[in-house]
Amino acid sequence: FPTRRSSDLEVARVLHQKIGRVSYVDTIVCMDGTEVIGAFLAEEFEKEDMASTNRHETIYVVSPEMNSNNQLLFRDNIKPSIAGKHVILLSASTTTGKTIHRSLEGIRYYGGVIEAVASVFSTVSEMDGFAVHSVFHAEDLPGYAAYSADDCPFCKKGIKLDAVVNGFGYSKL
């Protein structure tokens, strides 16, 4: 997705407000191309009198890779920004919560301490014991629906998809 500085800044401000006070933030793990929002979110937290275990007292903003099993992969140069660090997970869109679940598993695997979960859009309010703080919800999009392939009423009727949407954008078919 192309990004607009002003929109990303406003989303970061709203997410910061929704997350509220967090004692420690060392790292923001950005999924789905949310690095610009993540940088602004880090800036919002740094304005507070917030503690960090980072020596330089600034927040890391990192993005993982995904392996062939859709598991998070942090390279050796990124691992120190996760291991033993207080982490906020940030995603663009959360529909089922599966990506958040896998991401939380991955962050824990690499030794991170999850402090908060945020998503620009989410139909899920909680995942693995963490509130999912979001700017937009399903109620904000009249007629919004998401289905698994097995339960899709359009698929059952043979109605073809118009487009595919993911973290990179949408493509008409």
Segments from the language model and where they lie:
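Short, small-residue-biased leader/transition segments that mark boundaries at the very start
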Residues: 1-6
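Short, glycine/charge-rich flexible loops or terminal/linker lids adjacent to PRPP-binding catalytic cores
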Residues: 35-88, 95-98
